[in-house]
């Protein structure tokens, strides 16, 4: 079995005699793990032609090395810095063995929680100019669909949609306002991406419970991050929607960042115990492994996963 097949088994919610697959939306510790860092925007400034292609090739090689070392089923190409660079990275990955993995990229043109400088202006506009906001949202959604189509045509099999809709105390808009200004466009984009043949993973942090049924009803294949920091219980989410959607994540990132190991173990084992049975679970953190998470803590989290059952990659 290839890593790709392992991931597909989980996305299809099929029971397997193995531990669940794993991956992270972002794994930013490659310098500590591999002695290689991902490219930054600054690396590509004023670089073109063969030199740019070489840098993108090094980027693709880092993705492959990390996926192999960490036994990921997915390789997610980060949103970076242009769509053409993403597509070129995907092509290089496909040429160098990336087809053994589920190639994944981002396309989510729905409103997300605005940053602090824009928040009040955004919510006032919903009241003062709703028709203009809806027209903008519709046009932006269509651009997201076109972006997703180009990624799929380049070889991406899984699209992530990572607009955050929720704070730790609930959605940033009421469910009714979410339906009007976000939900209809979220549904449109999910359905279009699936019509193009992609699997769709929806990510949002925070307390998703007031929106849970809405998020799943769109027809997504998987839901990430099942945020324990916001009090979301993966056992309850599994009970409510586990027959309709694959669940991803829920290992407490605060515990991964701060420790101790006993707390990391408790969170990891809770996820494996309550989300793995019956299939339809992908092991991972409740967000991403970002700079600042001690590598040894993340590797400990993975060691608990390795102990939880056999790997199809080793059979």
What are these model-derived regions, one by one?
Residues 1-68, 72-315:
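Active-site loop segments of alpha/beta catalytic cores
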